[in-house]
């Protein structure tokens, strides 16, 4: 268990379960206001041979039992499972099942990164979406299917071209910027940057100004939705999503 900020009486409390390999904690914290207590815990490590096996194993509800109950025991009013592919790998029904399991473990408001991304894209008025991601096949196609089944027209699906899933952990912000600019599409209402391993906080305002449309990232959407679930707002100057309220908000 990792307590990320100091508890003060009366503060809203939220919790995050991150996949064991999550490395962007410091960046994620930039979206949280100082008067919200947020606590992060991690899943157990899982063995895997490829991208699909990794996210499939991390997408099992049983993996969330211990960390979710720990967060609930510490007073979390809402909990998010912070992992994109882990929460879309089994489709819309699988994402819903994860939230239902989290609720069964005692969470009052349960969210996932993939579910938050859908809410975020709808909030900015997107119907046609360009997607940038670090995945290998067939995980990329599962992402496209998840978005389509959620009501979006995926007009472009652009990979970062990484050789392995581990390479996502060392992607630099400029690589993300270059990939989003290259992966945008004239017909897209918004761009979605999938994967919580990618750095996006400082890139989002630059990209939105350059492209003239909303750019939503996985970590941004998760923080936005989780904070909205307890009636709070995420911080981030020049990020269009943050002008809107989540539909799951309190």
What is the role of each PLM region?
Residues 99-103, 108-163, 243-248:
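Conserved beta-alpha
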Residues 1-66, 132, 137-172:
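N-terminal glycine-rich anion-binding loop in soluble enzyme alpha/beta folds
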Residues 12, 36, 105, 109-123, ...:
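Hydrophobic structural segments
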Residues 217-250:
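C-terminal functional extensions of proteins
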Residues 61-74, 175-188:
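Short, well-structured alpha-helical segments in soluble
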Residues 178-207, 223:
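Hydrophobic alpha-helical
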Residues 68-111:
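Glycine/small-residue-rich loop that forms an oxyanion/phosphate-binding "nest" at active or ligand-binding sites
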Residues 17, 77-82, 130-131, 188-195:
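Periplasmic-binding protein-like
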